[in-house]
Amino acid sequence: MYIKNFITLLKRYTTSSLLNIIGMSVAFAAIYLISVQVRYDLSYDKVIPNSENIYRLESPNRYEEGKWSYHWNRQWPDEMCSGVPEIEASGSIWIYAADAVDFSIKRNQTVDNLKIVMSSAEPEGLEVFPFEFVEGGLEEFRLAKGIIISEEIAKKYNLKVGDFLTVGRSLESGYELNIVGIFKNFPEPSNISACEGWINMGSQQNAQINNFNDPYYVRLNEGASHVEVEKKMNANMIEAWKKEGKSEEELEHLVKRYTVRLNPLSKIYFDELS
């Protein structure tokens, strides 16, 4: 009966009925697209296992009042984290995708050119995030010329642990990097999922202490209070500055400039202050 009435109305008011149907279809499509986008936004970086315990180390932005910066030198963050029992892992790592890097590899008598989106990290930085290796691992990554690549890239270019990639096209540079690990791709949506490989940042001893350029992340024990950890980290840094012989005036400036906060990984996507 309902179908019969619908057909009757459709025949009598064809144009208006079709417009209503089209309008409702567009409305439902819009609602669907909005719900997909909302779900995407709300799950961003939360899809990373243990993301609720991972934080980015930040300090007040010196150029914009009320905002925060996440660039650090290679030395201070480790001093801040030293001896804090709630910290399971910590280190410098870039989890944002950079430009693709040109590589080349010689196979038999041919040279293949590849492009891989690379980031950089120190081994301790990689340990903050839940890398799952299908081949190799982080043991050899500590070597100066060790790199790790994603499983997707390994399959795309038919690469394996032990292969040497030359930086640049057509073997021009002669500078080789050794693939020491192949990891499972991280789930999306997340920043880290866009990175296809990591190269070792190199030794802290060779890094300039006044070079504030690298992000630093920490992973806390389950149930740990990041606010309490912040207090301990700040206390560690103040003690280190005192040992360096900083004056009261210098200490006041440094505390104001570098009092830290731990920004949850799951909230960074929406954070407009950093």
Regions found by a protein language model. Name each.
Residues 5, 20, 29, 33, ...:
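Amphipathic alpha-helical recognition patches that constitute DNA-binding helices
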Residues 24, 95-99, 268:
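Short active-site-proximal "capping" loops at secondary-structure junctions
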Residues 13-40:
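Short, strongly hydrophobic transmembrane alpha-helices
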Residues 2-13:
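A short amphipathic helical element positioned immediately N-terminal to and/or at the very start
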